[in-house]
Amino acid sequence: MSQYSQNQSSGAYPTPPVSTGPYMTPPPLGYPTSDISHATVAPVETKSKGDGFLKGCLAAMCCCCVLDACF
């Protein structure tokens, strides 16, 4: 017969601790969270870039119309 009994616990494997819930991984770096400790952020200032974009779009549309009329 075996010298170890099935009913005796040897203490090699202690009982696991009580879990408080499933493990949640932290969000990736830079991901906004609901943590309000970083709420002191300076306001963002926007700057006008002028009307260069609008002029460029109008020039492109005129160029397309001229090419369409020529060919």
UniProtKB/Swiss-Prot annotation:
Mostly expressed in roots, stems, rosette leaves and siliques and, to a lower extent, in flowers and cauline leaves. It comes from the Eukaryota. InterPro entries: CYSTM_dom, WIH1-like. The keyword ATP-binding does not apply. Residues 1-12 have a biased composition (Polar residues). Residues 1-31 are annotated as: Disordered. Residues 14-30 have a biased composition (Pro residues). The chain crosses the membrane at residues 48-64. Induction: Induced by heat in roots, but suppressed in shoots. Accumulates in response to cold, drought, oxidation stress and salt. One of its GO terms (cellular component) is cytoplasm. It is found in: Cell membrane; Cytoplasm. Pfam families: CYSTM (PF12734). Keywords: Cell membrane, Cytoplasm, Membrane, Transmembrane, Transmembrane helix. It is a single-pass membrane protein. Heterodimers. Interacts with CYSTM6, CYSTM7, CYSTM12 and WIH1/CYSTM13. Belongs to the CYSTM1 family. Involved in resistance to abiotic stress. This is Protein CYSTEINE-RICH TRANSMEMBRANE MODULE 4. The lineage of its organism: Eukaryota, Viridiplantae, Streptophyta, Embryophyta, Tracheophyta. The gene is CYSTM4.
